[in-house]
């Protein structure tokens, strides 16, 4: 989600709200708050998509089989390869294709991705409330 008026941040947590991003295998640096700061040139939807990608990456390391997210767009459309190419930039399209492939593999191995309301999502940054 968006964070503290400084741009987009990504947060991935366990059910208790503890950040899991230290386990990301991409070397993305985690800030003091346990989030990855993307700056102001990425959209919130891009951040949500990257969050799902990172969550699947972390789940593959930990053996977790359930991932929850609060973005309808990412969970029900983009991560299934459903998007309008003409309305998105190349970075977002590239990430959509990676997430779609990763989701297929995650689900083939018994993984599930489910929607949860932002009101009860422990990873929700809460700045939109």
What are these regions (language model features)?
Residues 1-46, 58:
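RNase H-like nuclease fold core
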Residues 3-5, 10, 24, 65-68, ...:
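C-terminal functional segments of enzyme domains
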Residues 35, 51-53, 97-99:
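Residue-level detector of functional hotspots within protein domains
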Residues 46-63:
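Metal-dependent nuclease catalytic cores in nucleic-acid-processing enzymes
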């Amino acid at each position: 989600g968006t964070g503290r008026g400084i741009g987009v941040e990504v947060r991935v947590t366990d059910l208790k709200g503890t950040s899991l991003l230290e386990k990301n295998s991409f070397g993305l640096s985690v800030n003091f708050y346990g989030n990855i700061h993307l700056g102001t040139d990425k959209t919130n939807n891009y951040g949500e998509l990257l969050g799902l990608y990172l969550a699947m990456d972390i789940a593959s390391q930990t053996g977790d089989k359930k991932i929850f997210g609060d973005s309808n767009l990412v969970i029900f459309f983009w991560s299934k390869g459903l998007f309008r190419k003409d309305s998105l930039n190349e970075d977002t399209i590239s990430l959509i294709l990676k997430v779609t492939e990763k989701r297929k593999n995650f689900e083939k191995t018994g993984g599930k991705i489910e929607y949860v309301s932002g009101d009860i999502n422990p990873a929700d940054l809460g700045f939109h409330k």
